[in-house]
Swiss-Prot record:
Keywords per UniProt: Pyrimidine biosynthesis, Transferase
EC top class named in words: transferase
Protein name: Aspartate carbamoyltransferase catalytic subunit
Catalytic activity: carbamoyl phosphate + L-aspartate = N-carbamoyl-L-aspartate + phosphate + H(+)
Length: 307
């Protein structure tokens, strides 16, 4: 029987006090990546972390790698395209074999929402979900929260703020994780997308981006995940962008002088999701999200491996 071990599979695995602890620690690292204590570095020095990514990643896998190295740990990234899964080895057997090598933590990404929960049944080391199907991406939600926490000056100032998710909400694990986390913190939520990209939900919805901009203090644009669509929804991405791109013109006309915050989990389709000029605007926090990804993942790794 596996020993009890803390995992991070979804944001609900964390209490509000633990979320606050992570925000405080990540804020320190966001201000100075070198602010790792000597004690932490000594404890992390012999830790070995394995990254098992069965889906493509740029920001998340690089962010975890840099976070691990900054803490003083070692990370092993497996290329799953050249692993034994390509020879017919099952996912569970691959995981059990890696687990038998006794890493100190495993970070995984997979196309199926249930995968991290299945793997956690066998894991005696911390397991971190770096994206599962369309359901969860907890560290992305936490780094997005850190970005808002910094901008608005604390959790108490986030309560009552309004956030609109614009784009392929139905297929977005980022949206799903953020919605669950931000609801716990008292934010009001609107979903904006064509009907085919909206989930069945009791949340407020609209098909009109102008309505979403008028509603929101925070806009989170989402990539159109064509790889998860059974059939084309728009004739082209350009047609989609004509309806749902966050542009300077739309912000000027409908933000009503609000200093809206603009987020995107990446990768951004320029001039489809967000206009290039808006990405360079001070209201865009996209690169801050990327920086905060390293800081938050440092905090998460330290929390799971040392606390």
């Amino acid at each position: 029987m596996p020993k009890k071990c803390r995992h991070l599979l979804q944001t609900s695995d964390l209490s509000l006090d633990e979320i606050k602890l992570l925000l405080n620690k990540a804020s320190v690292y966001a201000n100075d990546f070198n602010a790792v204590s000597l004690e932490t570095k000594e404890k992390m020095h012999n830790k070995i972390i394995v990254a098992l990514f069965f889906e493509n990643s740029t920001r998340t896998v690089s962010s975890f790698e840099i976070a691990s190295l900054r803490l003083g740990a070692k990370i092993v990234k497996l290329n799953m395209q050249t692993s034994s899964t390509s020879k017919g080895e099952t996912l569970i057997d691959t995981f059990k074999n890696i687990h038998a090598m006794q890493p100190d933590a495993i970070i995984t990404r997979h196309a199926f929402s249930s995968t991290p929960f299945k793997l956690a049944e066998f894991s005696q080391c911390p397991l971190i979900n770096a994206g599962s199907g369309t359901s969860a991406h907890p560290t992305q939600a936490l780094l997005d929260l850190l970005t808002l926490y910094q901008h608005f000056g604390g959790l108490e100032n986030l309560k009552g703020k309004k956030i609109a998710f614009i784009g392929d909400v139905k297929n977005s694990r980022v949206a799903n994780s953020n919605i669950k986390l931000l609801q716990r913190l008292g934010l009001e939520i609107m979903l904006c997308a064509p009907s085919s990209m909206l989930p069945s939900t009791p949340l407020r919805t609209t098909h009109n981006i102008e309505e979403a901009i008028e509603f929101a203090d925070i806009l989170m644009s989402l990539r159109t995940q064509t790889e998860r669509h059974n059939a084309p929804i728009f004739a082209s991405l350009k047609d989609y962008g004509n309806a749902y791109c966050i542009t300077q013109q739309r912000l000027k006309a409908h933000a009503k002088n609000k200093e809206v915050v603009i987020l995107h989990p990446g990768p951004v389709h320029r001039d489809i999701d967000i206009e290039s000029a808006v990405l360079e605007d001070k209201r865009s926090k996209v690169l801050e999200q990327v920086k905060n990804g390293v800081a938050m993942r440092m905090a998460v790794l330290e929390f799971l491996l040392l606390d």
